[in-house]
Amino acid sequence: MAPNIRKSHPLMKMINNSLIDLPTPPNISMWWNFGSLLGVCLATQILTGLLLAMHYTADTTLAFSSVAHTCRNVQYGWLIRNLHANGASLFFICIYMHIGRGIYYGSYLYKETWNTGIILLLTLMATAFVGYVLPWGQMSFWGATVITNLFSAIPYIGQTLVEWAWGGFSVDNPTLTRFFALHFLLPFLIAGLTLIHLTFLHESGSNNPLGVTSNCDKIPFHPYYSLKDLLGFMLMLLPLMALALFTPNLLGDPENFTPANPLVTPPHIKPEWYFLFAYAILRSIPNKLGGVLALAASVLILFLSPLLHKSKQRTMTFRPLSQSLFWLLVTNLLILTWVGSQPVEHPFIIIGQLASLSYFTILLILFPLAGALENKILNY
C-alpha cells in the first residue's frame, strides 16, 4: 500500500497531528473555540497590518496624514484600516474569554501551557499599545506619554529608562519610529509563541468541562471540531464586519481625529476599552510606584492561579461557591472597565478603589478559601 503523504511527510505529519488526527475530548463546548478564533484573529491582524504598513509613514510630520491617505485614496484602505482597528478589539474579547474559560475549567493546571499563554497576553498588550501610538492622533501621543512615563516610577533607573525608551526627552520622532518597528515585529513573535503554546498543549491534550481524563474516548479533531470551529469563525466574522462597516469608530476615541499636539493636553486621557480595567487599578492608588505595581500585578497575578488552586475538583462545573465567585470577578472586571472610562472624581474614585481591592481579594483569598471549603463540605 502506498504511504499516506499526510502521515509520512515531515511537514504534513506535523499539521496532521495538530489539526486533523489530533485526539480531542468528545465533550468540549463552544468555550474551547476561542483558541482557534485567536489564531484567526492573529492571521487577520498580520494580513491587514501588512497591507497598512505598505502605505504608512513612520514620521511625526507624515504619520497622521499617511493614515488619512490610506483611508481616502487606497483601494479599500478604509476597510483594511477598520478591520485592523476593530480586529484588535475582537482579539482582546477572544483572549479574555479564553482566559476566563481557563480559570473556570481549571485549565491553568497545565502549567506550561498556562504560563506561555500569559506571556502571549503580555506580548499582545505590548503590541496593541505600540500600535495605538502609530496614527499619531492626540490620544495616541498622550497615551504614549502617560504609559511610558510610568517607567519613571522605577527607583534609581526610572528616569534614565524612560528617556532611553523615548530616544530623547519627550515622545517624539524616534519614539514613533521605534514603536512602528516594534509593532511590525511583535506579531511574528506572538505567532512563534503560539506554536510553543500549542506544543505544550498537545503534550497533555485538551482539558474538558468535567475536568476528568478523557483518554478512553477521544475523537479526531477533523471533521468534528474543524467544522465546529468554522461555525465560531462565522459568528466572529459577523460582529467584526458589522463594526468595520457600520460603526467603525464606535470603540475609538474622537480625540484621535485631531493630529498630535504636545502643547494641548486632552481633558480625559484614557486607553482603548480593553485596557481600561488595568488603567482603573492603576488610577485607584494615589502613589505612582504603588499604582504601577498594582497595574503589573493585575495581569501577573494570573501566574499564581495554579498555586492558588485548593479544590480537589479541577473545574468549577460542580462547585457553586467558586462559580459565584467567578461571576463576581467577571462583574468586578466590568465595573473596573467602566470606572476606567470615567473622569477622576467622586464617586468613581472610591468605586475604582473598592473594585480594585475586591479584584485582588477574590483571586488571592476568596478562590482558595472557597476551594478548601468545598472540599470540606464534600468530605474530600
Swiss-Prot record:
It is a multi-pass membrane protein. Its cofactor is heme b. GO terms for biological process: mitochondrial electron transport, ubiquinol to cytochrome c. CDD domains: cytochrome_b_C, Cytochrome_b_N. Gene3D superfamilies: Cytochrome Bc1 Complex, Chain C (1.20.810.10). This is Cytochrome b. One of its GO terms (cellular component) is mitochondrial inner membrane. GO terms for molecular function: metal ion binding; ubiquinol-cytochrome-c reductase activity. Keywords: Electron transport, Heme, Iron, Membrane, Metal-binding, Mitochondrion, Mitochondrion inner membrane, Respiratory chain, Transmembrane, Transmembrane helix, Transport, Ubiquinone. It comes from the Eukaryota. Heme 1 (or BL or b562) is low-potential and absorbs at about 562 nm, and heme 2 (or BH or b566) is high-potential and absorbs at about 566 nm. It comes from Falco sparverius (American kestrel). The keyword Lipid biosynthesis does not apply. It is found in: Mitochondrion inner membrane. Belongs to the cytochrome b family. The keyword Transit peptide does not apply. Heme b b566 binds at residues 98, 197. Component of the ubiquinol-cytochrome c reductase complex (complex III or cytochrome b-c1 complex) that is part of the mitochondrial respiratory chain. The b-c1 complex mediates electron transfer from ubiquinol to cytochrome c. Contributes to the generation of a proton gradient across the mitochondrial membrane that is then used for ATP synthesis. Pfam families: Cytochrom_B_C, Cytochrome_B. Heme b b562 binds at residues 84, 183. The cytochrome bc1 complex contains 11 subunits: 3 respiratory subunits (MT-CYB, CYC1 and UQCRFS1), 2 core proteins (UQCRC1 and UQCRC2) and 6 low-molecular weight proteins (UQCRH/QCR6, UQCRB/QCR7, UQCRQ/QCR8, UQCR10/QCR9, UQCR11/QCR10 and a cleavage product of UQCRFS1). This cytochrome bc1 complex then forms a dimer. The gene is MT-CYB.
